[in-house]
Amino acid sequence: MLPSKVYLSKGSILIDATLTEGDNRGRENFTVMHEVFHQVLHKNCFRRETPDYIHSTTQIALNGKKSLKTSLDFIEYQANACAAAFLMPQNVVRDEFKKRSSNLGAKYPLPCDCMVESIIYDMADEFSVSKQAMRYRLNSLKMITFDAPLFN
C-alpha cells in the first residue's frame, strides 16, 4: 500500500508493486496506459505541486460508475477512456464481439449473461486487458447491457 504522498521527480510514473502480483497482466496493462495518458493529457495539472509529489487515487476513481463532480474525477475519467481506446480500439472490439456473438442474436446491446461473459473472458485475454475493462468497454460501445439478472 502506498503512503498518501511519495517523493518523485517530475515525469515519473509510480506503479504499486501489488499490481504485478498474481496473474493479472490485463490490469497491469490498463493501469500503465492509464498513467501514460495522465502524462500526455494532464502534465500541467500537477505542475503546481511542490515538492514533486504524486497522490495515490482511490479505487472508486479508477473503476466503476461515479459522477464527475471534481477535476480529479474528470481527469481520471479521461485517462480511463484513453487507455480503453488505446488498448481496445472501438472498431476492432466491436467487429470482434459481433463475430463472436453472431449466434446469440443480432440486436445490440446484448444482455450480459453467461454466454456473453464467456465471450468477454476470451476477448479480455486476446486484448490483454482485465475482464472488467473489457466489460466496461463493450458496455460503453453499447454492445452489452448490465440489465441481466447476473448484474442485478
Locations of the language-model features?
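Active-site hotspot residues in diverse enzymes, especially metal/ion-binding acidic/histidine motifs
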Residues: 1-152
